[in-house]
Amino acid sequence: MKRLVLLALTVAAVGRLSAQTAVERVTTDLKYLADDRREGRGLGTAGLDSAGQYIAQQFARIGLTPAGPGGFFQPFTVDSTAPMALHMHIAGVHTRNVVGLIPGAGRLAGQVIVIGAHYDHLGYGGPFALDPESTGVVHNGADDNASGTTAVMEIARRLAQRHAANARTIVFVTFSGEEEGLLGSTYYAKHPVRPLDSTYAMINLDMVGRLAGRKLTIFGTATAREFPALLDSITTRDDMPFTGSGDGYGASDQETFYADSIPVLFFFSGMHPDYHKSTDDWQKIDFPGLVHIAEVASDVAWRLATRTGPLTLVEVPRPRSAMGGEGYGAYLGTIPDMSESPGGVRLSGVTPGSPAAQAGLQGGDILVQLGDQTIKNLYDMTDALRAHKPGEAVVVVYLRDGKRMETKATLGKRGG
């Protein structure tokens, strides 16, 4: 009996040590990526190149096989025909994805699981920043998306230790140019390191650093019929409550793969007031929560890598682009709840001091109309903002506790 007690205590201690080590690892990784010296990982900066070099070094230490034409790097140049190339003055910029893989085994080795995250951010602000007063200040993007990049590295460490007689090849890729219109994932889809038609599923991690007691959101749960049951079994075992949400479209890199008829999952810990602001710093990251998400994503990835049956793709038409290559439009300062909200856009909060805050909007409100535009989803909301200019006063219609209300907001100007 004494020996059993000692064994149990030893196992518990090892578990605690392992968990602590993981927290230390992700803290080190994320703090490097979100350091001021990375220059906000803006496209074309030396800071972004430095971040890519760090990721490649970690891939090498983990033991991944280099998968790009330049070792771990997949370089590309932003084409002038890219949707936002001219608007953002980025045509001709040289950048690179970082790609490594774990070779598969047995009869499943020819199929591929892609696990990805974008590692770029806004640099020193610009037209997509939501704090116009901070243009020229480093936007470190700790949550967006140093957190997802860090999670990809941690998942790679975990999966590199797993083995099976039959397993799909697992490709890990961190994408550049996501903020400018999914440039890195689009380039990868056109130049995959393994044939795209052999890709079984894609897992994307974007903004996974602010769990802090909230439910994880997993988008794309309806892109394969088998996903809901698979996710329920793993998240229940791993004690990770989650909210499943819809198709595979949305403003992150999984959209590129879903548009190519690949089932996708997108892990997301939620919006917050620091989104696309210079205040998105490492001190606000929930590191134990980030480790927990990486653990769950690892288990999901391994189940997908080793299951024998096919996935049944569920396709829906691609919605119109919410960007159209012209930016987001005037500034309101709402923080949308990215989970589905039929009949409008539910807010998780508003930015203090913003036009939305001054108009009395608050978290939990559901926006249903902006000016003359009916709002059913985020695409409608973006279109409505693009239809107005900074300084215009618009009527905002919203639901609060089921009651239809309206207010007037004077729209502001975005950074740039």
Regions found by a protein language model. Name each.
Residues 20-44, 48, 52:
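Mature N-terminal segment immediately following signal peptide/propeptide cleavage
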Residues 36-46, 85-89, 133-145, 161, ...:
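Second-shell loop/turn segments in exported
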Residues 273-317:
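His/Asp/Glu-rich mid-to-C-terminal helical/loop segments that flank catalytic regions of hydrolases
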Residues 307-416:
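C-terminal recognition in membrane/secretory proteostasis and scaffolding
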Residues 98-100, 109-111, 115-121, 125-182, ...:
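Alpha-helical metal-binding/catalytic segments enriched in His/Glu/Asp
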Residues 4-12:
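Sec-dependent N-terminal signal peptides
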Residues 107, 175-272, 286-290:
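Metal-dependent peptidase/peptidase-like ectodomains
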Residues 41-103:
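A non-catalytic alpha/beta surface segment that caps or lines the substrate-entry region
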